[in-house]
């Protein structure tokens, strides 16, 4: 089980979109942008300048028609769950970071720097959206925890190899990032997971039978018997 403040840094395969939501007023002084400090300020919503709430595919602008059904499904689910998706200024993100999901605040952020690249934006939404699925799989999106959904064998070895190389300094994140990266490459996996999370009648672990470590956690916390 993983408790994280920042859950998921989507690298080269990520991106998102513009739209509505007024800019915030005075933000805290940030001594240096494009750092973990500026990302953290954005994630906890202490910094709101140059961030826009997006609630539908239309907020992303043109070029997303080929992903219409998948995006409509994702936004319908995130809106129902209460996950807020923001398009944010590139100044907040560390180099190579294109998206973030905050497991404690249930906020998903996409760098506006990639908005004109629908393929990259879709990768980011799928990747960070899968971290929201992991959040849900830990029992509730309100408990600040994440749980694995798939067994190691369900993620292709080539994906594992890339994630192991990228996250050598944070090995505890590797299985979570491997799942998210595989979801980013896959049509509808994130959409399906978020739909399961948003279903008020059926728990997500009834749709996705939990792997042993996740099942143990759910039993220990009283989510299942």
Language-model regions, residue ranges each:
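Sec-dependent signal peptide recognition
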Residues: 2-8
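C-terminal motif of bacterial Sec signal peptides marking the signal peptidase cleavage site
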Residues: 14-15
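Short pre-active-site segment immediately N-terminal to the catalytic Zn-binding motif
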Residues: 108-125
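Catalytic Zn2+-binding segment of zinc metalloproteases
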Residues: 129-146
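Metalloprotease/metallohydrolase-associated module, dominated by Zn2+-dependent proteases
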Residues: 145-225
């Amino acid at each position: 089980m993983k408790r994280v403040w920042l859950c998921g840094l989507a690298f080269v395969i990520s991106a998102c979109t513009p739209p509505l939501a007024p800019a915030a007023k005075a933000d805290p002084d940030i001594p240096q942008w494009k750092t973990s400090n500026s990302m953290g300020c954005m994630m906890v919503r202490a910094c709101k300048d140059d961030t826009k709430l997006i609630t539908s595919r239309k907020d992303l602008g043109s070029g997303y028609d080929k992903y219409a059904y998948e995006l409509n499904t994702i936004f319908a689910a995130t809106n129902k769950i209460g996950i807020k998706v923001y398009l944010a200024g590139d100044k907040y993100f560390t180099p190579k970071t294109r998206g973030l999901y905050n497991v404690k605040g249930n906020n998903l952020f996409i760098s506006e720097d990639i908005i004109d690249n629908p393929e990259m934006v879709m990768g980011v939404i799928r990747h960070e959206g899968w971290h929201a699925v992991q959040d849900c799989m830990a029992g509730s999106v309100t408990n600040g925890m994440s749980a694995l959904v798939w067994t190691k064998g369900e993620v292709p070895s080539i994906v594992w190899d890339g994630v192991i190389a990228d996250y050598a300094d944070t090995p505890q994140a590797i299985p979570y990032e491997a799942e998210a990266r595989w979801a980013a490459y896959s049509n509808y996996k994130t959409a399906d997971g978020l739909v399961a999370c948003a279903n008020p009648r059926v728990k997500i672990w009834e749709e996705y039978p939990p792997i042993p470590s996740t099942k143990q956690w759910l039993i220990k916390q009283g989510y299942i018997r």
